[in-house]
Swiss-Prot record:
Example GO biological process: phosphate-containing compound metabolic process
Source organism of the structure: Thermus thermophilus (strain ATCC 27634 / DSM 579 / HB8)
UniProt-recorded Gene Ontology molecular function terms: inorganic diphosphate phosphatase activity; magnesium ion binding
Protein name: Inorganic pyrophosphatase
Record-listed Mg(2+) 2 binding positions: 71
Pfam families in alphabetical order: Pyrophosphatase (PF00719)
GO CC terms: cytoplasm
UniProt keyword annotations, A-Z: Cytoplasm, Hydrolase, Magnesium, Metal-binding
Top enzyme category: hydrolase
Amino acid sequence: MANLKSLPVGDKAPEVVHMVIEVPRGSGNKYEYDPDLGAIKLDRVLPGAQFYPGDYGFIPSTLAEDGDPLDGLVLSTYPLLPGVVVEVRVVGLLLMEDEKGGDAKVIGVVAEDQRLDHIQDIGDVPEGVKQEIQHFFETYKALEAKKGKWVKVTGWRDRKAALEEVRACIARYKG
């Protein structure tokens, strides 16, 4: 089986990228791709009454500041399955820090979903949806503080900043 982390980033990158889905929208389970197993495995069950507000995964052939592929949250009409590779239109960036350092999340939409064609930049995402995303990431590790886990959201950035982050992570991956 191919290493999902090294799949192509996509021919239209950085505007449209491939994203490997690890966690479907609505899940209270945190799944992660394990390249040693060649499979997506359960990392943990979120300890609170929380669920992912979008489909969560990573952009292959990228390297973020934390040493992992660049994370992303995808807005979709219907939940996507773990292991699916989806073309995602990059629309914004959520800047965060956690116990490991910088941990930005690309925000995107399914590129081939006409219901989402109107979302081109983070300003097009309804305010309530952005608040839900921010609240999730601010609190999803709160009950794990005794284990040294924490998160701080430092702000939202527009599509231009998100594209710059994707470019930087592609360049870092290439070395």
